[in-house]
Regions:
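Cytosolic covalent-transfer regions centered on His/Cys nucleophiles
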Residues: 1-148
Length: 148
């Protein structure tokens, strides 16, 4: 999988407004709906929240990767949202999440989701890359961190 096939300015939001996990998830989902990548908003929201109930997708270093499998997408879709002040996402390290990468994949496919997350992880593994993301003023700044 090539990350550049999944990321574009249409799926990047550099100033999330949500202040709770639920609000951030809804806001990111709306980005995908507006980009016409999701066919059923509520089905996807329920799938995302069910995943969060099983185990938080808040990782470490201010990164959260809300994700779900759903019938509402035909192939893997993704979006990126930033909130420099952070939101409590019940992260593994207890710190607020500030970088959000949402992925949705079809129920019957595993590979693309894992490949996409591996590629993203390679980019955001350094503090320098995460700081560059958080300082992004627009979608093109975000894409440049990913080499796009």
């Amino acid at each position: 999988m090539n990350i550049k096939n999944k990321l574009s300015p249409a799926v990047i939001k550099t100033s999330l407004q949500g202040t709770t996990k639920e609000e951030v998830i809804r806001e990111l989902l709306e980005v995908l709906v507006e980009a016409q990548l999701v066919t059923d908003r509520e089905t996807v929201y329920e799938a995302l929240m069910e995943r969060e109930r099983k185990m938080s997708t808040g990782l470490q270093h201010g990164v959260a990767i809300p994700h779900a499998k759903t019938t509402a997408v035909k192939s893997l879709v993704a979006c990126i949202g930033l909130k420099p002040e952070g939101v409590d996402f019940a992260a593994l390290d207890g710190l607020p999440s500030r970088i959000f990468i949402m992925t949705l994949s079809p129920i019957d496919r595993v590979g693309p989701h894992v490949q996409f997350l591996a590629e993203v992880s390679m980019v955001i593994r350094t503090e320098e890359a995460r700081e560059r993301l958080l300082q992004s003023k627009n979608a093109q700044d975000v894409l440049s961190v990913f080499g796009l």
